[in-house]
Amino acid sequence: AELSNLPFETLLSENSKTNDFRKLPYLIHKYNFSYSLSSSITKLNNTKRRKLFERMTVFSPSFEGQNLTQLQLSKVTAKAIANEFKASFFENKEANLKAFKNALQENKIISMFSHGQSFNDFENNKKGIYFSDGFLNLNEIYNLKSNCDFLLLGACETGLGGKERGEGNISLARAFSSIGVKSMLLASWKIDEESTMKLTESFLKYLQEGYSKSEALQKAKLDFLKTSNPRNANPFYWAGLNIVGNNKNIKPHQTQNYLWWILLIFPLAGWVWYYKRKRVN
């Protein structure tokens, strides 16, 4: 059962005697991976055609009074991502449960950088993700409504859950998928904040370039390995993030600045009118 949390990309394609994590022949050098909860869910996720471009919403909550560490690096990265993709940005107290529930219904890409937790037992009220005003647990997720195409959860253990016979991994992925979320980027363990921020920024860049979700994540991880020191090349730092669900590309929409077009078109139209009038005269 524990193998369900093992990313296939960390397996080796051949025997190796090296102890240097950077030089090991991981499968990620040859293949990209995405995961499915079940064949029926996969079929459901692929039935409805979605728009290629989608607006993004980014969440970065603060945690006053919740006995949690503030994720300062995540906040900086979240703001940079929001600026890059002209996304709606909810930070600190604005990144609350109500705002998240509303965003789920607006057919957007959602990036959430927060604290998450899970336990390998059946206490679903202890599995979930933190917002500025509280904790959204697994049972509560089943009661939400969603039109979300892609949910990026940059938080610990969001892909981890208890095992039930005949049901598999009872995780946030299962809950969000059941309410209509088409695909997710989730964490299989307690992830490192710095490496997660590097990976998600790079992942979104490749997603914008047109790669599928698993291809974009593969490229982000390979870039990370190329620039890592021997310690950070350990799979703990890069293999925890994985794609679950629909693997098709979806580009975060970058809003055009239409003001520049207006400033260009009006003088041009005026010049054309003046030129035609001059010719008539």
Q: Model-flagged regions — what are they?
A:
Residues L3, F59, I81, I110, ...:
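Residue-level detector of buried hydrophobic side-chain packing
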Residues S74-T77, I81, N96, F100, ...:
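Stable alpha-helical elements in mature extracytoplasmic
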Residues E2-N5, G65-N67, L97-A99, Q117-N120, ...:
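Flexible loop/turn segments at secondary-structure boundaries
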Residues A1-N107:
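Catalytic-core domains of enzymes
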Residues S4-L6, L24, I28-K30, Y35-L37, ...:
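Caspase-like cysteine protease fold
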Residues S88-N92, L185-L186, K213-L217:
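Acidic/polar loop patches that form or flank catalytic/metal-binding clefts of enzymes
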Residues Y35-T42, N46, K108-K198:
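Catalytic cores of nucleophile-dependent amide-cleaving enzymes
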Residues L68-V76, E94, K163-E167, E194-K198, ...:
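Soluble non-cytosolic domains of exported or imported proteins
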